[in-house]
């Protein structure tokens, strides 16, 4: 409804990217593919630069990674997209990945593997449209951070955090883990 569409003419039918038939990989296959010994009790983090703000979100990314590190949350981190400042984001992610034994930074997973991972994760955290669009199809709770997805219709699986603080992250994690 961002462009003035009439609400009664909009029919939410799901994500077009989910129309592609895929075979779900087993947990064991994914562990081998990702080189992770135990793929349980984990979240998936996808955090992209915010291109329409002066602050690209790099400080938010650092705060988020610090909070997840401090609570020892096993986290599969996917590379950010290729927007402006994505190289800076990747460098921060690599730095945390090297210092934290509960972080697993991975490049392009491919759509089939990505969907399989969404089906196994406990929750997703970040600012990716994937959390708004695809995650609900897997009944995956999502913590959506910041303004990047403002204006998008979202499901009940999404918890929004506007102000990124450790306390807000903790509260949101408790909320999605109780779903």
Q: Residues of each region from the PLM?
A:
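Nucleotide-activated sugar donor-binding and catalytic core shared by glycosyltransferases
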Residues: 1-179
